[in-house]
Structure formats: C-alpha cells, structure tokens
C-alpha cells in the first residue's frame, strides 16, 4: 500500500511539472525569435555550449566507465582470485557527536564486514566519548568475531576530524603493516553494505600505482522530503562524475564517508601531516589552516606523492544524513558553504601541480570549477536584463529552456542506477543558481570555515588590523566582481 501511495505521488509530481512546462510554452509570444533577441540567444548559446559540453563529456565518460570499462576490469580482478587479497585490512572508524542509534548501525556493519570478508582484519575505533567505546565493546562481545579479527581503540580529543584521523593513522603505523595491507577510512555516520570490503580491497593488486579509491554512496536523510531529494540528487550526480574521473584514474576527492588506501600511504609521515595540519598561503588572506576538507587534503597529498585514484561503483555504502538546520534553505546553504569552500581552497594549488601530473582532462575540469560560479548565473542574469530591456517574454523563454533541459538531465541521471524524482529538475536549477552564488561568496572568504555537525570554527588569532582588512577586502572584492559581471552583460545584451 505504501509503495502504491509513493508511486501515485511521484506520478502526480511529474504531471504537475509537465503542466508547468506546457503553461510556459503557451505563454510565449510568437515574436520571441525576432532580430531583437539575437544577442540574448548568442550569449545563452555560447555559454550553453561550454556548460553542456562539459556535462555531456562527463556523462559519456561516466557511462563508458560504468558499463564498458569497469565490467572488463572487474573480470580481471576476479581472475586474480586470492592473489589479489591484501595481507591485512584495517577498518578505521572516526566518531564524534553522532547519536547512539546511528553509531550502533555503523559499527554493526563494520564488525559484520570484518568477519565476513575472510581476511585478517583490525577494527580501529577513533573515539572521543567513553559511551561510544562501551557501546562498541558490547556489540563486539555479542558478535564474538574469530581470532583473525582484532579490535583497537584510539581515544582522541574532540578537536576535529583531522586530529581524529591523524591519531588513527599513527595507531595503524604502530601495527607496522606491510606493503600489501590496506586501510579503509570510514566516517561515523556510514553504514557499510554487504560485501563492500571484498569489492574494494583487491583493486590495489590490479593497479600498482593506485594509492586510494572511493565508493558509491546512497543516503538515508533525517529530514523532510525536499532535503531528502536534494541529498539523493547530489549522490546521483556524484556517481556519474566519479565514474567519469575514474576513467583517467583521477577521482577528485577521497570521500570521507568511506575511502580505502594502501597502508603504506596512510602511515607515510608526509600524508599524515597533510591530513592533520593542511594549510594555504593566500596572497590576501594570509596563511591559515584547513579546518574541514580532509577528503580534499588526502586527495591532494596522493597527487603530490605521485599516486593515482580510483572509484568502485558497485561497492556501496549508506550514509545517515543529519541536516544542520530544520529549514531546507538554511541547511542547504550551510552545507554548500562548507563543501564549496573545501573545493575552492584546494582548486588553485591542485592546478599548480601541472598538466603533466594531472592530465589534460583533469586540468580542464579543475579550471571549469573556477569559472562555473560565473557561467552558472550568466543565463539567468542575461534573461533578467533582456526582460527589462525588451519585455518579460525573454524571461519566460529562459525558464522554459531551463525546465526542458533540467528534465532531460534528470532522465539521464536515471542511467546512473540512482532513483530520480519529480523534484529533481527544480532542485538541479536551485543547485546551479544558489550554488554559484555560494561559490562566489566563499571564493573571497576562503579563510572562514566551520563544521556543520559540531560547533567548531577556525580561530585565526590575527592582529586586529589583519582581521579588519580581511573582512572589508572580502566584501569589497565580492561587490566589485559582481558589479563588473553585471556591467559587462548590460553592454552586451
């Protein structure tokens, strides 16, 4: 009955969306394509060629990897058999301020995987609270794992995830793992699907230079319908982009929810230092440490140390998402601020590694991340200007174009294996516009960081003048950049 109700609601949602598109089409005057609109169409088309060519390229590459390349590679891994088994598996879980129910789900799945993978395994628990340790010990005693499965606790101060990871990596170093050992780094809100360890650990024997790989994600959201759909859409987009970048062995982030590394990587003092105390020397904002973005730091460290990165699309995990605010608008903006800040803090120095290290396609993708904050809002800005100059029909034309293209993009996302819903087209456009505005805002404020789960913010300890200068120079540059952007478009439309 519940399934039928859900299906009917989905169908009603799609019918409502299609009705909106038909209403927009009916409202358009026949004179919309006269000579007055040539500059409008040229600008929208020129930017569209760049944006859609990047999207289509990612999609085609992703489908080639998912349905052609990866199945071939998986057959090669299976032929290796037990020769691809690592000597030891470390499953390291970091937990802080996560509710007991989620913690129990996470450790239940981790202990199950440690037992069922059939390999010598050590579960490393990087914990802050004693209550979590008591819970894990109780679950461990109940599971009664075989002797080849060990348990190791690392007590850490509640000073952030980076410190928790570094303490855990040093604890693994004390086990003195050999070159065939691997380490899975798992977040405290990540529930492992069955067989995820067995599906991820053999790849390091197939690819000698892969230093780390990451996994496919699905989610359970403790929030409303729109918040849930928003997260699910992001994971569907992530899946295609990961597949695309895996084709070049240049996956752009070692996702903190679950990634697997060679043990010799996470025990490398340089790698530990990169994750624990990563920093950026900015020409205007000075030198500051990274509070968040350990997944980006680990990726950059792998690139700098000369390793490749990979993605295993059929190794899935389920994350339990706790929105930081009850309001969708507030929660999504807060999460975007953190995610895009992490992305942009890594972007410029990643490009500094050079085309020879990154490859041509990866360099283009990183460059696109920098310009997309402006190209994403160009169409809407031009449509608004044109509607003031020539009439509101131009805005209707733009909205119809957006509605049709986002519908097509949503249907294409279904090929990723993730479910789609009728809210996806509108959420896609919300992400484009609000995401671009958040990127512009954070681009000029890279030194401002905070966690969404815990009340931890970056303390700069700057002199009063430096703090004043950073604040006002950020505001001035944001206003100047926005003004120049609009002024240029006003002269062109």
From Swiss-Prot:
Give UniProt keywords alphabetically.
Answer: Alginate biosynthesis, Cell membrane, Glycosyltransferase, Membrane, Transferase, Transmembrane, Transmembrane helix
Question: Single GO cellular component annotation?
Answer: plasma membrane
Q: How does it sit in the membrane?
A: Multi-pass membrane protein
Where can this protein be found?
A: Cell membrane
Chief place where the protein resides: membrane
The record's function comment reads: Possibly a processive enzyme that polymerizes GDP-mannuronic acid.
Which BP terms in the Gene Ontology apply to this protein?
alginic acid biosynthetic process; extracellular matrix assembly; hyaluronan biosynthetic process
Q: What top-level branch of life does the organism fall under? A: Bacteria
For this protein, the parts annotated as crossing the membrane are 13-32, 47-69, 380-402, 422-444
Q: EC?
A: 2.4.-.-
**GO MF terms held by the record:** hyaluronan synthase activity
Q: What is this protein called?
A: Glycosyltransferase alg8
- Which InterPro entries is this protein grouped with? Nucleotide-diphossugar_trans
Family statement drawn from the similarity comment of this UniProt entry: Belongs to the glycosyltransferase 2 family.
Decide whether keyword Iron-sulfur is in the record. Answer: no
Q: Which residues form a coiled coil?
A: none
Q: List the disulfide bonds.
A: none
Name the pathway it acts in: Glycan biosynthesis; alginate biosynthesis
């Amino acid at each position: 009955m519940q399934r039928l109700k859900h299906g009917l609601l989905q169908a009603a949602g799609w019918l409502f969306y299609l009705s909106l598109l038909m209403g927009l089409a009916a409202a358009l005057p026949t004179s919309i394509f006269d000579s007055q609109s040539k500059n409008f169409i040229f600008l929208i088309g020129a930017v569209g060629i760049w944006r859609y060519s990047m999207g289509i390229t990612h999609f085609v590459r992703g489908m080639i990897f998912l349905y052609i390349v990866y199945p071939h590679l998986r057959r090669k891994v299976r032929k290796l058999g037990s020769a691809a088994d690592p000597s030891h598996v470390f499953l390291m879980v970091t937990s802080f301020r996560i509710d007991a129910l989620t913690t129990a789900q996470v450790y239940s799945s981790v202990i199950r995987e440690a037992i069922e993978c059939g390999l010598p395994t050590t579960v490393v628990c990087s914990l802050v609270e004693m209550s979590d340790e008591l819970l894990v010990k109780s679950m461990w005693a109940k599971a009664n794992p075989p002797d080849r499965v060990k348990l190791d606790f690392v007590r850490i101060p509640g000073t952030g995830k980076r410190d928790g990871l570094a303490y855990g990596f040093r604890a693994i170093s004390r086990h003195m793992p050999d070159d065939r050992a691997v380490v899975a780094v798992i977040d405290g809100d990540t529930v492992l699907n069955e067989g995820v360890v067995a599906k991820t650990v053999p790849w390091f024997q197939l690819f000698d230079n892969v230093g780390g790989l990451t996994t496919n994600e699905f989610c359970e959201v403790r929030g409303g319908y729109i918040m849930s759909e928003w997260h699910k859409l992001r994971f569907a987009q992530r899946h295609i982009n990961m597949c695309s970048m895996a084709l070049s062995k240049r996956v752009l982030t070692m996702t903190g929810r679950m990634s697997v590394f060679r043990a010799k990587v996470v025990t490398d003092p340089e790698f530990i230092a990169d994750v624990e105390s990563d920093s950026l020397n900015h020409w205007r904002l000075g030198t500051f440490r990274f509070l968040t973005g350990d997944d980006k730091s680990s990726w950059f460290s792998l690139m700098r140390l000369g390793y490749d990165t990979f993605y295993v699309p059929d190794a899935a995990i389920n994350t339990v998402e706790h929105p930081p605010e009850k309001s969708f608008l507030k929660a999504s903006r807060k999460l975007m601020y953190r995610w895009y800040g992490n992305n942009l803090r890594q972007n410029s120095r990643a490009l500094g590694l050079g085309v020879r290290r990154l490859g041509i396609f990866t360099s283009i993708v990183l460059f696109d991340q920098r310009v997309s904050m402006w190209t994403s809002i160009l169409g809407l800005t031009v449509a608004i200007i044109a509607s003031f100059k020539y009439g509101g029909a131009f805005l209707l034309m733009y909205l119809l174009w957006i509605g049709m293209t986002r519908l097509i993009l949503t249907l294409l996302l279904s090929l990723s294996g993730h479910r789609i819903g009728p809210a996806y087209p509108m959420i896609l456009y919300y992400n484009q516009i609000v995401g671009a505005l958040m990127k512009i805002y954070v681009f000029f404020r890279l030194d401002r960081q905070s966690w969404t789960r815990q009340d931890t913010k970056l303390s700069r300890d700057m002199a009063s003048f430096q703090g004043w200068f950073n604040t006002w120079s950020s505001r001035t540059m944001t206003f100047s950049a926005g003004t120049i952007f609009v002024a240029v478009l006003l002269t062109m439309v």
